C-alpha cells in the first residue's frame, strides 16, 4: 500500500520535477555564488512562490554553512528546511467543539472542488462516528445540489436544501435550526462560488454569517476557503475577497495532484497568516489529507 508521503510526493511531481531538475541543472559542477543564487531565486519565483517568500528563503539560504563542494541534494535539503520554516503558521489543527454543534462555512469559486471536499469531509467525520449535516446554500445552481446529494448519500449524512433560487441565508438558518434539533455534531454549509459578480457573492456570504449568528453568536466555528492549486497567482485575490466577507479561519487546497503551481501555497500562508487544514491529492475520500508542512516542503523540492 502506498504511504501518505509517497502519495504526496507523487501528487506534487508537476511542481517538484520543475524545481528538482532546475536545482540539478543550476548546481551541476558549480559552486554556490551570486550567479547560482540568482538562478535559484528565479526558479523558485517561477514555481509560483511569491517574491517576498523567495527573498526570505534566499536571504536565509545565504546564512547556511555549506562545504565548498556543494551538490544538488544538499541544496534541496537546505531548501526544504527553509520552506518548512516559511510554513510555520500553516499547521494549526482543524479543531471541533465537543457536545456542541460545529458550523463549518465552506467557500470557494466554482470548480475549486468545494462540493466534493464537503462530501469527503462529511464521509470522513461520519466514519469517526459524528452526526453530520450539509446545507445546500448554492440555491441558484441545481447541479450543485445534485452533486452534493450524491456525496451526502455516500456519507450517510443529512442534506438540508431549499427551493431553487431561495435565499441562501434562509437555507443556512433553517439548516442550523434543524441541526440543533437533531443534535448534529457538524453542519457543513456549502455556498455559491460565482465570482463574475463579486459584490453580490460577498454580500451573500456576509449575510449567511450574520443570520447564523442569531442562533449562535460564535458561529461559524470555522470559515474555510477551498482553493484549487492549479489557479496559481490568482489564489491571492480569491483569499483576499473571501477573507473580507467571512473572516476566514483556514484553507483547504485541492487538486495538488494536477498542479505545477503548488508553490503558491507557501506565499498564501505567509501573506494571510492562515493555516492549511487539509490538502487534496486525489479523487478518493482518503485522498483528503491533514496538511503536514514537513512532508509538503520535502515533496515540493523532490526529496
Swiss-Prot record:
GO terms for cellular component: cytoplasm; plasma membrane. It is an enzyme of class 3 (hydrolase). It catalyses: GTP + H2O = GDP + phosphate + H(+). It comes from the Bacteria. Gene3D superfamilies: P-loop containing nucleotide triphosphate hydrolases, Signal recognition particle SRP54, nucleotide-binding domain. One of its GO terms (biological process) is SRP-dependent cotranslational protein targeting to membrane. Coiled coil: none annotated. It is a peripheral membrane protein. GO terms for molecular function: ATP hydrolysis activity; GTP binding; GTPase activity; signal recognition particle binding. GTP binds at residues 108-115, 190-194, 254-257. CDD domains: FtsY (cd17874). Its main location: membrane. Keywords: Cell inner membrane, Cell membrane, Cytoplasm, GTP-binding, Hydrolase, Membrane, Nucleotide-binding, Receptor. Transmembrane segments: none annotated. Involved in targeting and insertion of nascent membrane proteins into the cytoplasmic membrane. Acts as a receptor for the complex formed by the signal recognition particle (SRP) and the ribosome-nascent chain (RNC). Interaction with SRP-RNC leads to the transfer of the RNC complex to the Sec translocase for insertion into the membrane, the hydrolysis of GTP by both Ffh and FtsY, and the dissociation of the SRP-FtsY complex into the individual components. Part of the signal recognition particle protein translocation system, which is composed of SRP and FtsY. SRP is a ribonucleoprotein composed of Ffh and a 4.5S RNA molecule. HAMAP family: FtsY (MF_00920). Belongs to the GTP-binding SRP family. FtsY subfamily. NCBIfam families: ftsY (TIGR00064). This is Signal recognition particle receptor FtsY. It comes from Rickettsia felis (strain ATCC VR-1525 / URRWXCal2) (Rickettsia azadi). The gene is ftsY.
Amino acid at each position: 500500500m502506498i504511504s501518505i508521503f509517497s502519495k504526496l510526493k507523487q501528487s506534487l511531481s508537476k511542481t517538484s520535477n520543475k524545481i528538482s531538475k532546475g536545482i540539478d541543472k543550476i548546481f551541476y559542477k558549480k559552486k554556490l555564488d551570486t550567479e547560482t543564487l540568482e538562478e535559484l531565486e528565479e526558479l523558485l519565483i517561477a514555481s509560483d512562490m511569491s517574491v517576498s517568500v523567495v527573498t526570505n528563503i534566499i536571504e536565509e539560504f545565504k546564512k547556511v554553512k555549506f562545504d565548498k563542494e556543494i551538490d544538488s541534494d544538499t541544496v534541496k535539503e537546505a531548501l526544504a528546511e527553509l520552506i518548512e520554516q516559511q510554513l510555520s503558521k500553516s499547521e494549526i489543527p482543524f479543531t471541533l467543539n465537543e457536545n456542541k454543534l460545529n458550523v463549518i462555512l465552506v467557500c470557494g469559486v466554482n470548480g475549486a472542488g468545494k462540493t466534493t471536499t464537503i462530501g469527503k469531509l462529511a464521509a470522513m467525520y461520519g466514519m469517526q462516528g459524528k452526526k453530520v449535516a450539509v446545507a445546500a446554500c448554492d440555491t441558484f445552481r441545481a447541479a450543485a445540489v445534485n452533486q452534493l446529494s450524491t456525496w451526502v448519500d455516500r456519507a450517510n449524512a443529512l442534506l438540508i436544501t431549499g427551493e431553487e433560487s431561495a435565499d441562501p441565508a434562509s437555507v443556512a438558518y433553517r439548516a442550523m435550526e434543524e441541526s440543533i434539533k437533531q443534535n448534529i455534531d457538524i453542519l457543513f454549509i456549502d455556498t455559491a462560488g460565482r465570482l463574475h459578480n463579486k459584490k453580490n457573492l460577498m454580500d451573500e456570504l456576509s449575510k449567511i454569517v450574520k443570520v447564523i449568528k442569531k442562533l449562535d453568536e460564535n458561529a461559524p466555528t470555522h470559515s474555510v476557503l477551498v482553493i484549487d492549486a492549479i489557479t496559481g497567482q490568482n489564489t491571492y485575490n480569491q483569499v483576499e475577497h473571501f477573507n473580507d466577507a467571512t473572516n476566514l479561519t483556514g484553507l483547504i487546497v485541492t487538486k495538488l495532484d494536477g498542479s505545477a503551481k503548488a508553490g503558491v501555497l507557501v506565499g498564501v500562508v505567509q501573506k494571510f497568516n492562515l493555516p492549511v487544514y487539509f490538502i487534496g491529492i486525489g479523487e478518493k475520500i482518503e485522498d483528503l489529507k491533514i496538511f503536514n508542512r514537513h512532508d509538503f516542503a520535502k515533496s515540493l523540492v523532490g526529496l
